Curated annotation (Swiss-Prot):
GO CC annotation terms, alphabetical: cytosol
Listed pathway(s): Sulfur metabolism; glutathione biosynthesis; glutathione from L-cysteine and L-glutamate: step 1/2
Reactions the enzyme catalyzes: L-cysteine + L-glutamate + ATP = gamma-L-glutamyl-L-cysteine + ADP + phosphate + H(+)
Protein name per its UniProtKB record: Glutamate--cysteine ligase
Gene: gshA
SUPFAM superfamilies reported in the protein's UniProt record: Glutamine synthetase/guanido kinase
Keyword Phosphoprotein: no
Source organism per UniProt: Escherichia coli (strain SMS-3-5 / SECEC)
Amino acid sequence: MIPDVSQALAWLEKHPQALKGIQRGLERETLRVNADGTLATTGHPEALGSALTHKWITTDFAEALLEFITPVDGDIEHMLTFMRDLHRYTARNMGDERMWPLSMPCYIAEGQDIELAQYGTSNTGRFKTLYREGLKNRYGALMQTISGVHYNFSLPMAFWQAKCGDIAGADAKEKISAGYFRVIRNYYRFGWVIPYLFGASPAICSSFLQGKPTSLPFEKTECGMYYLPYATSLRLSDLGYTNKSQSNLGITFNDLYEYVAGLKQAIKTPSEEYAKIGIEKDGKRLQINSNVLQIENELYAPIRPKRVTRSGESPSDALLRGGIEYIEVRSLDINPFSPIGVDEQQVRFLDLFMVWCALADAPEMSSSELACTRVNWNRVILEGRKPGLTLGIGCETAQFPLPQVGKDLFRDLKRVAQTLDSINGGEAYQKVCDELVACFDNPDLTFSARILRSMIDTGIGGTGKAFAEAYRNLLREEPLEILREEDFVAEREASERRQQEMEAADTEPFAVWLEKHA
């Protein structure tokens, strides 16, 4: 089932320097909660400055949903320490609140008034809040409080030059973009390995079902927790953060222009379903527009091609201008075993897997095959640890045992690891391979199995509160390592100044401005 990567691996072993200079970045979301696990109703902590313009700490959907962002970094340990500093400073500046350590929220009732993230009075800030109003009215606020980790990854120019010859200008844009689309297609085909190893949401609180019927064969504990005994990541299931109305958009990942055309079409295509919500009610705007996507960011995807946008530029226009610059991996649950929601083992694994995805042959993928890849993902998400589980290739009928496919993949990853270790020194990447490959013969080692044992003992709420309390105490005590207190104070002041400047510069009324942007 795994493509034959032997020639590409042999090429890599002859060109190890092609991997020198991998760049990455992390984003981590987490809900602010009270000591009893309920959602914090306070505003964004003052010490964290403006959520609209702060470089490192912002908010996602809700005012209580923090998002930490590291700068681009070539050093894994430095990046993780930077992320830890962001958590340390925040833990010291959020009063008695703490950070929820799980992807799935618990103590939130459907219909509870979850305050949308607030970004001030500038047109840009009001637009961001209106987008969230649209998300709430389309999908419900509860789904939007699910948290995850995003891992951003780019290969060095040396890799593309070694692989594609001496490239520059428009030629480089085309070839590098084609290379990243290969990564994306392989990710759709084999990325289920991420929830298998690192999925950490095998259970949900009963409030999450919102009284809706479900066809999933949930088991229920006395405290009202619903779980699937072999599930890995209910966050990635249809119960979690997905968008069924997008499944027939036909967006594919074979070509830059085709992809962008599909995305631009989706933001122009009217939706009957969303038209029923209305645009405005009693003088209050309910969504930006009633199209399938209000804006491009609404496209749900487990992986995204990205380029840093310029002021006023849409994500797709940035891609058209310069091609794909990096990949955003979006399938990581919060790691409940780490105070910062992600750890070095995961980052090193993702490095290995992304390199493998760039090397492995990846035939073009139709929208129907893309839909077929969802079958493997769903199996792993809902019953990934089930003995005897098999996976298929695309829409073909042949089936392969998951443990065998996993071990075959890791045979290749071990060779990538040897190459990365040869240029970085040490054996850190090989060690990660040795640790993780054991999960295929022993699924009890996976994150989902480990966290489910705790959840069955103490419930999701009990587990979440215990980790949150422990991490709060730990992070508050640890000294900062990279950033200093004065760096945070300076960024707070600078972010507030940037927001004020944006607000002062706006001359158009929001309604007029919105007509141009909706």
